Amino acid sequence: MALLRALVCGLLTAWLYCSGLGLPVAPAGRRNPPPAVGQFWHVTDLHLDPTYHITDDHTKVCASSKGANASNPGPFGDVLCDSPYQLILSAFDFIKTSGQEASFMIWTGDSPPHVPVPELSTDTVINVITNMTTTIQSLFPNLQVFPALGNHDYWPQDQLPVVTSKVYNAVANLWKPWLDEEAISTLRRGGFYSQKVTTNPNLRIISLNTNLYYGPNIKTLNKTDPANQFEWLESTLNSSQQNKEKVYIIAHVPVGYLPYSKSITAIREYYNEKLIDIFRKYSDVIAGQFYGHTHRDSIMVLSDKKGSPVNSLFVAPAVTPVKSVSEKQTNNPGVRLFQYDPRDYKLLDVLQYYLNLTEANLKGESIWKLEYILTQTYDIEDLQPESLYGLAKQFAILDSSGVHVQILQDCYIDIHMPWWFAASIAPSPMLDISNSIPPQSPYPLLSFP
């Protein structure tokens, strides 16, 4: 499978800050506001580092820096470290006090830090997930939350098994307040489940364990259907189709190619193709897909075999700001709010929020800000696959002209890699609209010399 990449990473920023170059500025407001709007939050990749602390020895600020000098550690973290608890608490406190009413929250995995395997254990991983779960439950006692397991939510990392395990049992017990008995049962068995939304009885969440398909997972090598999840998924989607339900798919590791590669799928290619086939077959049932893992803000459009767009997929940016020493750039912490039509669960919009980490550390307070509203910034009708596909075609025209490359060169310094992706000539079931630079912030990307 080839993935057509038609959107420049960060082009949106260029629209907003380089208006002198003659590109259109999106008008404010949606063209056709719906009579009612439902909302839900998406948080991902919390990556709590319990060892984080301020010390004069910057090599010892956090275990997740792996001995590297933390660059500018403050109360809300550092770009070479995973999240201190104060950062995670500030994210959830912002959600709680934002004034936005939401029907539910999706939480797509990865609670433990990025540290070498010997520095963790099964009990430590469970303790971190417990900490994050109880934090969410204490702040949102009446909100239904739908978690998905990440590749770091296990020890050793990535090695999630095809049978029940201590971690699967632990999270099943922790997440009982949010799930029914059938969901708990499948969660114990294979780390996945489906569950109706209490406030929206015709909407079902399917939480997949895509870590079973992740390349580094040696537990699933040479298995055609690890934990029988494919069979279960098809059966669940078929039941939803018969019962006239709509489904949101959530998972940690996304389908499709990685945002920084034109040839590497995030999961093993066989499993990727199998999931794509299932998603195409039930595209009339699936109303949206939501992932984490890459820490990058990305959008993909799934097309059917005739090339028509049939599904919208969203990869959310992370709460953790961590990067490796070799990386030049990283993300500010982010959370997002999706809007949907409660009549048919079609996705209408996404509001992306971020925390300027440098500013928060300097001021000693966290002020989360609206980064962008997708439909207003891009001047599209909604988040339906047809709208996103039309947007991608506009960027493909810009891509063929080379205009956007010059825009990025004019608007950014310290760009050491091409922030554009050539369109693939091969037939493509998925169109990747990837945007890894936050588009509206005066500090859109933390950058390093």
Provide a role label for each language-model segment.
Residues 84-149:
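Long, well-ordered early-domain segments
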Residues 50-52, 113-116, 147-158, 214-216, ...:
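Active-site environment of divalent metal-dependent phosphoester hydrolases
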Residues 3-22:
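Cleavable N-terminal signal peptides of Sec/SRP-targeted secreted and luminal proteins
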Residues 42-44, 103-110, 141-150, 248-252, ...:
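Active-site neighborhood of phospho(di)ester-bond hydrolases with catalytic His/Asp-centered motifs
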Residues 109-134, 154-171, 259-264, 299-305:
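Metal-dependent catalytic neighborhoods of phosphoester/phosphodiester hydrolases
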